[in-house]
Amino acid sequence: MLPWFKNWFNSPYYHHLYFNRDEKEAAEFINKLIDHLHPLQGSRMLDVACGKGRHSLQLSGKGFDVTGIDLSEDSIKEALQYETETLHFYQHDMRLPCWINFFDYAFNFFTSFGYFNTQRENDNSIRTIAQSLKPKGIFVLDYLNVHYAEDHMVHQSEKEIDGVNFLITKWYDEQHFFKKIMIEDEQLKEPLVFTEKVSKFSLGDFTDMFAYQGMQIKEVFGDYNFKNYHVKKSPRLVMIAEKIK
């Protein structure tokens, strides 16, 4: 049986549901992040879990050499339309090694982590990213803030997008957040159901995972405007780490 994310991320309904999700906010966050980091022109950047490549394209347009990787073959096929001499895309599983000491920066945006069943798989993913960075390379991971997500969870919601109905149910246990999505479409004989599962990783968890792979967190922010991180009040957990080994 395939893991949930392989089926869901390759589903046309996934892209239908999330296509326009906060794109303006995402683009503004990336602009502010680049202003904060001050990368040199031509810096090599790795966009981990790049999806269809829209954010990789934005980074490339700022004068950087960008490589995007994603597990979804369909997403990468679509991203390939943007390829240039300084923008590259590959279908790749972040749990498996790739480049070694190659990139100046690596990014994992918008909670594109924490999907795997075992801690070994999570550690392997962080290892892949750490190994891909040059010494002193920078890794930015943007994750949900567990405590905020618990306190502000909307347990039931419904969305209608272009005639497709999405019934969304959210809950959590001690280790994971769950999101069940029931899809009703006239073209379907019966509703489709997908369930997302994301690990409840704290700042302490990431600190340990990064340290194990030779990276150290240097800065932490609590939203896309780079406000200070507050364990209960911040909607996001944005970590900037440096490869120190």
Model-assigned labels for residue ranges:
Residues 203-245:
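C-terminal lobe and adjacent flexible extensions of AdoMet/dcAdoMet transferase-like proteins
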Residues 140-209:
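SAM-dependent methyltransferase
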Residues 1-40, 42-49:
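Conserved class I S-adenosyl-L-methionine
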Residues 123-135:
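A short glycine-rich, Lys/Arg-flanked "PGG" loop and its adjoining helix->strand segment in the class I
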Residues 104-120:
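A short SAM/SAH-binding and catalytic strip from SAM-dependent methyltransferases
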Residues 95-106:
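A short acidic, Gly/Pro-enriched loop at the edge of an enzyme's catalytic core
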Residues 54-96:
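Class I SAM-dependent methyltransferase SAM/SAH-binding core
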